């Protein structure tokens, strides 16, 4: 609370390379991954995604769901991480990946991922009902941990280094979904009784 009251901020110095950040983004914040050799650390997120696809998605409410559809849905979600759009956009993307969903079935799968706390979409922020700027009102799509996105895409640190656009989006998800869920959202909520939302103009 002292920080919000104007108190001094602690200074932490760190000099990670871009490669270090790529690794940490793909490793994620899984406690079991911390301190492990890199290969084992990266495997934690993949094991989690496999568990969601093969069993957890059906076990959450007792409804049997097709692992292939779950896999493609999570891959599409990963392709659109840190972006805004309609469910229709994601439905079209899933179709391009080789599967077709009915809208009702699709929404049930999305809801199951939310119940499992796999996804953590960030609500849109509208500063003023009469704002001159055309503010987007769609939520921003995120997984609860950015490593879920990279695992769903089958991407590793080297892949992110070779595609900085995707790296930037997943890094945004790291900042918003992973860190803020544990730290920023809680601090803001308790210290200033505020909410945590996203703001983006329709032009970009």
Predicted regions and their residues:
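A generic structural signal for secondary-structure junctions
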Residues: 1-2, 153
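Accessory nucleic acid-recognition modules appended to NTPase machines
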Residues: 34-201
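Amphipathic alpha-helical "lid/sensor" segments that cap RecA-like P-loop NTPase cores
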Residues: 3-51
């Amino acid at each position: 609370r002292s920080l919000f009251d104007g108190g001094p901020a602690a200074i932490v110095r760190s000099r990670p390379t871009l490669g270090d950040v790529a690794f940490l983004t793909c490793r994620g914040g899984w406690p079991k991954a911390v301190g492990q050799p890199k290969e084992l650390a990266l495997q934690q997120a993949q094991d989690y995604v496999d568990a969601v696809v093969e069993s957890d998605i059906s076990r959450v409410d007792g409804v049997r769901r097709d692992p292939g559809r779950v896999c493609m849905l999570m891959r599409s979600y990963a392709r659109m991480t840190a972006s805004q759009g309609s469910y229709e956009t994601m439905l079209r993307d899933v179709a391009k990946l080789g599967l077709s969903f009915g809208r009702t079935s699709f929404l049930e799968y999305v809801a199951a991922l939310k119940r499992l706390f796999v996804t953590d979409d960030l609500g849109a922020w509208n500063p003023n009902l009469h704002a001159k700027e055309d503010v987007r009102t769609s939520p921003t799509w995120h997984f609860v941990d950015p490593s879920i996105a990279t695992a769903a895409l089958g991407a590793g640190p080297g892949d992110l280094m070779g595609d900085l656009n995707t790296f930037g989006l997943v890094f945004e998800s790291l900042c918003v979904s992973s860190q803020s869920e544990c730290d920023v959202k809680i601090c803001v909520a308790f210290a200033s009784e505020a909410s945590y939302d996203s703001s983006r103009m329709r032009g970009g």
